[in-house]
Amino acid sequence: MILLISDLHLQEERPDISRAFLDLLDGRARHAKALYILGDFFEAWIGDDAMTPFQQSICQAMRRLSDSGTAIYLMHGNRDFLIGQAFCDAAGCTLLSDPSVIELGGEQVLLMHGDTLCTRDLGYMKMRRLLRNPLSLWILRHLPLSSRYKLARKLRSESRTQTRMKSTEIVDVTPEEVPKVMAAHGVRTLVHGHTHRPAIHKLMVDGQPARRIVLGDWDRRGWALQVDEQGFQLAPFEFS
């Protein structure tokens, strides 16, 4: 069994989500061969050198799962792209490139966070290119902690404001971009998060039937994609 999740947006202000994640680690994930986390794992991450006690507790829980034999793979999201190798080493997880193609359920599957599919959101795409530039990443990681905290708060506030102002079409994936990206990677299944619109979409790629599986965000309930001998099963679950 393989589990895939995304968009938990873990933060101290939402202990219900944190407890649900810890329950997953102590429960279903213990029986999984691997757990994939496809971005926006944390609501914000300003650097491995600034881990709070809350973030350290999450890191330690992940390490316990990793030590038990479940492989953990973590992909950057737009909220936590400053997660680095130090955190991954401590948590016992592997940092996964976005995009990545893996074998899943007997086929090649493309994994993405999903933000790069939203090409109609021109303002966001411009900001993403700026922030993900290697020079920008170096500067961000070397800013004083106080400056990083202020910048993180500013970016989160602006993101919420912009999301409310933009149409749903702009902040969703661009329909034409999906088959183009899937064809470029030679896959018929794509799994991503980011949009907070869980669903399984059918489409055609190079004249062949394909599917796009969108993981759900964790808010009032959690979401997970389970891949086993029964196939690909996307389903929500209630927080205990």
Swiss-Prot record:
Q: Which InterPro entries match?
A: Calcineurin-like_PHP_ApaH, LpxH-like, Metallo-depent_PP-like, UDP-diacylglucosamine_Hdrlase
Q: CDD domains, from UniProt?
A: MPP_YbbF-LpxH
Could you say which residues bind substrate here?
N78, R79, D121, S159, T163, K166, H194
Q: Where does Mn(2+) 1 bind?
A: D7, H9, D40, H196
Assigned EC number: 3.6.1.54
Instruction: Report the membrane topology from the UniProt record.
Output: Peripheral membrane protein
Gene Ontology process terms (BP): lipid A biosynthetic process
Q: Where Mn(2+) 2 is bound, by residue?
A: D40, N78, H113, H194
- Quickly give the catalysed reaction: UDP-2-N,3-O-bis[(3R)-3-hydroxytetradecanoyl]-alpha-D-glucosamine + H2O = 2-N,3-O-bis[(3R)-3-hydroxytetradecanoyl]-alpha-D-glucosaminyl 1-phosphate + UMP + 2 H(+)
Q: How is the cofactor bound?
A: Binds 2 Mn(2+) ions per subunit in a binuclear metal center.
Superkingdom in the source lineage: Bacteria
The UniProt GO MF terms for this protein read: manganese ion binding; UDP-2,3-diacylglucosamine hydrolase activity
Location in or out of the cell: Cell inner membrane
What pathway, per the record?
A: Glycolipid biosynthesis; lipid IV(A) biosynthesis; lipid IV(A) from (3R)-3-hydroxytetradecanoyl-[acyl-carrier-protein] and UDP-N-acetyl-alpha-D-glucosamine: step 4/6
What is the enzyme's main class? hydrolase
Report the function annotation for this chain.
Hydrolyzes the pyrophosphate bond of UDP-2,3-diacylglucosamine to yield 2,3-diacylglucosamine 1-phosphate (lipid X) and UMP by catalyzing the attack of water at the alpha-P atom. Involved in the biosynthesis of lipid A, a phosphorylated glycolipid that anchors the lipopolysaccharide to the outer membrane of the cell.
* Family of this protein: Belongs to the LpxH family.
Q: What is this protein called?
A: UDP-2,3-diacylglucosamine hydrolase
> What organism does the record attribute this protein to?
Pseudomonas putida (strain GB-1)
